[in-house]
Amino acid sequence: DEQADLSVHGGLSKAVYAYPLEHYGFWRTVRAQARAGGWEDDLLPPGAMGEILTLDGLNERHLWIGDQLRFADGGVLVVSEPRFPCFKFNAAMGFSKAAKLMVESGYCGAYLAVLEPGQVQAGDNFTLHPGPRELEVLALFRARTSGKKF
């Protein structure tokens, strides 16, 4: 996998992008309102947000920097930071206000670093092991996007 701009994409702390499944309904709605195309029947399948890992039941309000996701068959990921949208997100979503809506909604997802390598497949279960619980992903996202234009 190659990344074009390593200042905002890739690197060890951004090895895995995880996005909450529950936010897909929001994006389907706003894409329909914007008359954005690109996906048949506007289904937005898992992975459409650019994530490698789609999380069910875990979002930015439940994830804290340093939390660990431990998978049953091996592999440990640690939450490192929220995703910050760039101009390419607008193009990927098919309308010009997508990045702005990500900032306003806080539906950003999170980057994860690999703490212990392992194999993870669709449907695998994991357990959340709390980190120090000092900084919530959404709080960090809000702090870093406050006052910036998208």
Where are the regions a protein language model picked out?
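Short, electropositive, low-hydrophobicity segments enriched in small/polar residues
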Residues: R70, A113, A122
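Loop/turn positions that initiate beta-strands
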Residues: G66, P117, Q121-D124
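Electropositive, beta-rich accessory/interaction domains or terminal extensions
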Residues: D1-F89, K97, P130-F150
